[in-house]
A protein has these predicted regions:
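A glycine-rich phosphate-binding loop feature that marks nucleotide/adenosyl-phosphate handling sites
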Residues: 88-90, 148-155, 240-247, 314-331, ...
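Iron-sulfur cluster-binding electron-transfer modules in prokaryotic oxidoreductases
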Residues: 529, 536, 690-1018
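N-terminal flexible segment immediately upstream of the FAD-binding catalytic core
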Residues: 1-72, 86-118, 147, 170, ...
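Ferredoxin-type iron-sulfur electron-transfer modules in oxidoreductases and energy-metabolism complexes
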Residues: 548-581, 585-723, 841-847, 885, ...
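Flexible inter-domain linker/hinge segments
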Residues: 2-4, 204-248, 254, 524, ...
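N-terminal glycine-rich flavin-associated loop
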Residues: 46-77, 81, 99, 103-148, ...
Length: 1018
């Protein structure tokens, strides 16, 4: 039995008082002080961890202004505040103690657009890709690019002055900010835009906080203008935080306070709104993927690409390429970046040409390719091959792979992981290759492995050395390397921070700004935030306050992680290896990961949030001398005893009375998970939440009783076959209002599915497929076996959607094969989901033994439901290891291509069919949609894939009362629009859960693709 974790870091009474006053005065947002909520805000995409006291989620600028006014009261003067966006920062920019002000949950509205003038006004929490999705119908996009664009907020981009691919042409975020609305400490509203210097002087003479800000920034930047121009490097990725250089335009005729706020990392004000310049979408885009024999060759050849008038040049090294090959993303780009025969591709330049003149762009591409051919013929520059990508879809797939590279590095094997701390250095592009030679020599001298990729056209290369942050010596080495890289960038006239902001690296600011300009930064900080209450420790302290700065060697996540025993860390690697890349925060509702995060917009209900909580839970267990691995081993031996039942009943009673246990907070986060397993493939680190969730639930319920519904769900494969003996009788009772009410109130289940009537057994009565024993099959000749197909049953289609199984048997027959319906053998998926892992292990072993015996017959085994079939490949392997055996159960679309003759039918024409894939299937088997389309094409029919996220049912998740509202809301995110837009009779759905959800919500059912094939065949 796990112990009660009764203590968690407390919250200061002053903080609680502040939050209470805030709510009393009309604050409309949310506040959070639970340990779980605070932990999810203690990390970002960096190596640092810093626990805040509370989190505030404002809904509007008015909420932020109220917050700032209340904070200005003398009794709350000691409280500090840090604005936070998407939490994707790589250097702890938004990590701090005190109170975190999260702009991402509610302040995500696009306020207005003026397409004629080319600008848009947004709130700070709008996500970059969300904005571009909105702008696309207008023919515009927001140009600054970054790899985390599907979860990074515009407020975060502005605060770090982010940039990425294409910056040589498009510049940084600050180049596209026309004006800002910000809230100052004290509650004053500051609106900024470029103004004539005369007006700036007038504003500076106003006797107000805003007036003092204008006056100070104007006077200090004007007085130091010559030094600023001399000191700031002449780089595309110019020095920001604070951007003294661009406050005035080159002619000194305009003054723009906006440029001080861009890159300020929340140290000056709360940025709540922005007016942004938007760019026309290019009509033509082409990519040339140039392959090299070494990474150095790719680097040294990059200037040649820029001279060819390319929009951008992105470079990827062999380490990143090889990690991409091992990821699901490679399936989407493998034909666009093929290997060169007899050559090893160790570097890649992704060269983009874009514009509105197709003839001009094609000529530029042709000229470049001709020159590349000449280099290859002469064996020069290390070029070994090239490919051109002409279509937009292919361009976007390649960039998706490149964007995922940053996360893929975290999936490197071993305890040492490539980490960010010197990953956005910038030097003049003409010096980049020589700089990288020295950088690599530095890392090689310490025996470190590393991955490299980046924007070579702008002189920025992302370098992530692999270090084990659980090793104190390697933590020291990180600081040593940082110091060396600072000196190296200075040697080449570059910057340590080319695009990701300073964060905990602010200690190096004096070295880059110089003593005089650093003093000016402090004066500017002082006029905005004289008491050092906004994200203190970042960029600089205000003049007059000698507060310490955050440092590179500050407390890191590894400080806490190393308190967990190595064996436990290794066993729970799914939770331990999450690096915070945040892909699970993807805003796109059509992306399968993560439905609970999408519907709640709460970080504790994301894979990252759940991994964070489990790590802390493991640490707290270790702190109490408890080894969860040993507890797991002991559980099967202990069995169920009266003593254990009494103890768990007592613990439940105390829990209902409000007794604190951190395990309850972890349980709450786990309960929101749909166990769809999208994270296990979509996450670059392959964080498998359902796997460690099941383990947690098993241990949690060693202390606390399970609800009745968990036992009912886990036992479905025991009672469903019995109920199917009399389906109409049981359906009669299931439909009774009193039973529905009883189920909802006392069991916590709603909309219970009806059994198939007639049952599968009744439908197959007398059919030869159901009358063959295993012994009869073993006695068949090889010739007879060649035409046999063994149908593996699952509990959901066989007992609740039997027509699908019956139709598959008919389809097999129509194709000239003899189907055999194998006896039902429990799969155990429901047991695994609910954390009955001891029972699941027994179920899995029994079924694996049966299927291994059947597999020896040499006949194909085929199952219908993706989630259940994939359980044989995933959960069985995790649980049984080598004892699983090597049986293979195919899905319908995997078997059909092998069964089809070479004679394809002519195109039938007519309306297409529309495929809705099960999210587990779509993410685990990315080729499935194309395979289904090819199968339909073989029969002369057209099948189009419908891009949707999760349907919201996920087995029994959608039937549980506590999940009902979220289940419907998840369906509404993407499925509902698609289902109502397309003809229902042409919509085909592979997953049983998904078909159930459609029928429940839309009132009419949909078919499995195999049923449409049966209709087509006639």
């Amino acid at each position: 039995m796990i112990p009660q974790i009764s203590q968690a870091p407390g919250v200061l009474q002053l903080v609680l008082n502040f939050l209470q006053v805030l709510e009393q005065q009309g604050f409309t947002g949310d506040t959070a002080t639970s340990y779980a909520d605070r932990l999810t805000m203690a990390t970002d995409n960096s190596v640092y961890q810093l626990l805040p006291d509370a989190v505030i989620f404002p809904r509007s600028t008015a909420d932020v202004a109220l917050l700032a006014r209340v904070a200005a009261e003398p009794r709350f003067k000691s409280l500090i505040f840090t604005p936070r966006g998407g939490g994707t920062g790589t250097n702890g920019q938004a990590l701090n103690g005190g109170i975190i002000v999260d702009m991402s949950r509610y302040m995500n509205r696009i306020i207005e657009i003026n397409p004629d003038e080319g600008w848009v006004r947004v709130e700070a929490g709008v996500i970059k890709d969300q904005l571009n999705q909105f702008l696309k119908p207008y023919g515009y996009f927001f140009a600054p690019e970054l790899s985390t664009s599907n979860r990074a907020t515009l407020g975060g981009m502005i605060n770090t002055d982010a940039s990425g691919q294409g910056s040589l042409v498009y510049g940084k975020t600050s180049d596209h900010v026309l004006g800002l609305r910000a809230v100052l400490m004290g509650g004053d509203i500051l609106d900024t835009q470029a103004v004539p210097v005369a007006l700036a002087e007038t504003l500076g003479n106003t006797p107000s906080t805003v007036g003092r800000i204008y006056n100070t920034v104007y006077q200090r930047c004007k007085a130091q203008r010559d030094l600023i121009i001399d000191k700031f490097p002449k780089l595309n990725r110019f020095l920001t935080g604070y951007d003294l250089r661009h406050v005035f335009n080159d002619e000194m005729s305009e003054f723009d306070l906006t440029r001080i706020l861009t890159g300020s990392e929340g140290t000056l004000a709360f940025i709540t709104e922005a007016r942004l310049d938007i760019t026309r979408l290019p009509k033509v885009r082409r990519l040339v993927n140039v392959k090299y024999d070494s990474f150095d060759s790719a680097l040294r050849n990059a200037p040649f690409m820029v001279e060819a008038k390319a929009l951008s040049v992105e470079t990827v090294d062999s380490k990143v390429l090889n990690l991409a090959r091992e990821d699901i993303v490679w399936h989407s780009v493998s034909e666009l970046i093929t290997d060169v025969p007899d050559k090893e591709m160790l570097g890649l330049n992704i060269v983009e040409f874009a514009g509105d003149d197709a003839a001009l762009i094609d000529q530029q591409v042709t000229t470049l390719c001709q020159r590349l051919d000449e280099l290859m013929a002469a064996s020069e520059a290390g070029v070994i091959g090239w490919q051109v990508c002409h279509d937009l879809e292919g361009v976007e797939r390649i960039y998706a792979m490149r964007k995922k590279a940053v996360g893929l590095l975290g999936n490197a094997k071993g305890a040492a992981k490539p980490i960010p701390f010197a990953e956005d250095t910038c030097v003049p592009p003409e010096h980049l290759a020589d700089y990288i030679v020295e950088f690599r020599a530095l890392l090689d001298s310490h025996g470190l492995s590393y991955g490299m990729f980046g924007h070579v056209d702008a002189g920025v290369l992302h370098v992530r050395p692999a270090l084990d942050m659980c090793d104190p010596q390697q933590e020291v080495l990180m600081k040593q390397i940082s110091d060396d890289v600072v000196a190296l960038t200075a040697k080449y006239g570059g910057l340590l921070w080319g695009e990701h902001g300073k964060g905990f690296r602010a200690e190096y600011s004096p070295a880059f700004f110089g003593e005089t300009l650093y003093a000016e930064l402090r004066k500017i900080k002082a006029v905005f935030d004289p008491d050092n209450r906004l994200n203190p420790g970042k960029i600089c302290p205000p003049e007059g306050i000698d507060a310490p700065m955050m440092k590179v060697d500050a407390a890191k996540r590894g400080t806490w992680d190393r308190q967990i025993p190595i064996a436990v860390r290794s066993s729970w690697r799914g939770a331990m290896e999450c690096n915070g890349n945040g892909l699970c925060f993807n805003f796109d509702v059509k992306s399968p990961m993560c439905p609970s995060m999408k519907v709640s917009n709460q970080r504790i209900h994301s894979p990252k949030g759940r991994a964070t909580l489990v790590r802390e839970w493991l640490r707290l267990l270790a702190d109490r001398g408890v080894d969860p691995n040993q507890l797991e081993k002991a559980l099967p031996e202990q069995g169920v005893s009266l003593r254990s039942l009494v103890a768990r009943t007592r613990n439940n009673w105390h829990a209902r009375k409000g007794e604190y246990d951190f395990s309850h907070e972890v349980k709450e986060a786990m309960s929101g998970c749909l166990a769809c397993k999208a994270c296990s493939t979509q996450c670059p680190i392959k964080i498998d939440v359902p796997e460690f969730r099941s383990r947690f639930l098993q241990l949690y319920h060693s202390r606390y009783l399970r609800p009745v519904r968990d036992h009912l769900v886990a036992s479905v494969e025991s009672y469903a076959p019995l109920m199917a003996q009399a389906p109409k009788t049981f359906n009669f009772f299931i439909n009774q209002p009193w039973l529905k009410k009883l189920s909802e109130k006392h069991i916590g289940m709603v909309d219970l599915p009806l059994l198939s009537a007639p049952s599968l057994k009744q439908q197959m009565a007398g059919h030869r497929s159901a009358n063959m024993t295993l012994e009869q099959l073993e006695a068949l000749s090889a010739e007879q076996k060649a035409k046999m197909v063994l149908v593996v049953q699952d509990p959901f289609t066989s007992y609740y959607d039997a027509q699908v199984v019956a139709d598959f048997i008919r389809l097999v027959e129509a194709l000239g094969y003899q189907p055999v319906l194998l006896p039902f053998s429990p799969n155990g998926k429901a047991q695994h989901i609910k954390g009955f892992l001891t029972r699941f292990a027994r179920t899995a072993q029994k079924t694996a033994d049966f299927l291994n015996r059947v597999a020896q017959l040499g006949m194909p085994l085929v199952g219908v439901d993706p989630a259940l079939v994939l359980c044989y490949r995933d959960e069985y392997k995790q649980t049984l290891g080598d004892k699983r055996g090597d049986f293979q159960v195919l899905l319908v679309h995997e078997w059909l291509p092998k069964a089809l003759t070479s004679d394809a039918r002519p195109d039938l024409g007519g309306e297409p069919w529309y495929l809705f894939g099960h999210c587990t299937e779509v993410t685990a088997l990315p080729a499935a949609t194309k395979q289904w389309a090819d199968i339909f094409a073989h029969f002369g029919a057209k099948l189009e894939n419908v891009s949707v996220g999760c349907c919201g049912m996920a087995g029994t998740y959608g039937h549980e009362v506590k999940n009902h509202a979220n289940s419907l809301a998840i369906y509404a995110l993407s499925w509902q629009q698609a289902m109502q837009r397309l003809p229902r009779n042409r919509c085909l759905v592979t997953g049983y859960s998904c078909r159930s959800q459609v029928k429940r919500i839309e009132g009419s059912g949909v078919r499995h693709p195999l049923q449409a094939l049966l209709e087509i065949i006639g």
